[in-house]
Amino acid sequence: MIPRRSSDITIKTRSDVLPFSGASSRWLQRYAPALLAVALIIAMSISLAWQAAGWLRLQRSPVAVAASPVSHESIRSDPTRLARLFGTSAQDPNAPPPATNLDLVLKGSFVQSDPKLSSAIIQRQGDKPHRYAVGGEISDGVKLHAVYRDRVELQRGGRLESLPFPHRSGGLLASADDITSENDSIEQLQSLQDENAAALRERLDALRQQMEATPIAEPAEEDSSEPTTTPTESD
């Protein structure tokens, strides 16, 4: 009698467990996709929140950003560093050439619309000022290359050198030496003009003498006499 009762109890327990396991499996099959979707959404939300927190940390840290302009300013204030980083800059093509060391003084410049027609008055040491045209030879190996309002350019040994007007040293009032030098320059310019006028007069006189010496051919006189015919009397 006892063994039969124990077997009945065991059978009742299995019958109670089997319906519960079947219901749980059906519930999992029904809601498994929804659970996976919820888990995926939660994971994505956590990832986005982590990225947003990192971005906010970068936006709230101005100390590192403010330190960079200081370094840029220090680089700008030191031209030697720029030269080492980027090398020496090319020279400005419009900049005048270096000043010449020749003993020459620029007295005047005549700038024309055609640069080839420009000229300048230059005085060498111990000599009178002379007027030179562009391309004219001032001394051995030195030629006048270009003429500007404030300077002239000389070609010497294949390179260009600039000869500016002499600068006054001192205040607004000119010294006696400056006044004397200016008077000398004016006299020298006047003498040059007189020489040019004298040369022009000589050329005109020579041309006039040449024209006077050349005989002018007179036109041949036309014979105005008309042939006369002797009238004959008819019988």
Swiss-Prot record:
Residues 56-235 are periplasmic. One of its GO terms (biological process) is protein secretion by the type II secretion system. Its main location: membrane. Pfam families: T2SSC. InterPro entries: T2SS_GspC_N (IPR024961). It is found in: Cell inner membrane. GO terms for cellular component: plasma membrane; type II protein secretion system complex. Residues 205-235 are annotated as: Disordered. Residues 1-34 are cytoplasmic. It is a single-pass type II membrane protein. Residues 226-235 have a biased composition (Low complexity). Keywords: Cell inner membrane, Cell membrane, Membrane, Protein transport, Signal-anchor, Transmembrane, Transmembrane helix, Transport. The chain crosses the membrane at residues 35-55. Involved in a type II secretion system (T2SS, formerly general secretion pathway, GSP) for the export of proteins. Required for the translocation of a variety of enzymes across the outer membrane. This is Type II secretion system protein N.
